[in-house]
Amino acid sequence: MHEFELEGHEFIELHNLLKVIGLVHSGGLAKTLISEGLVKVDGEVELRKRCKIRVGQLVEFEKEQIKVSA
């Protein structure tokens, strides 16, 4: 499981989170994977590329999980 700290920010957009963590090499690829329904947020398929991910949420892509903390 990966952990990502927002470091004082209120949120991070879903496509940026996948890129920053290193699960994808580009934001464009992240957007494509999200629009294809391959990413879940809190157990639900998320199709919004710019979905705001906040503290306490869990993002899943393939077999990887990302927990977002403050």
Model-derived features with residue positions:
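A positively charged, amphipathic N-terminal helix/segment that binds anionic biomolecules
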Residues: 2-4, 58-70
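A detector for short, charged/polar N-terminal pre-domain segments
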Residues: 1-12
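A basic, amphipathic helix-loop patch mediating RNA/tRNA/ribosome contacts
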Residues: 12-55
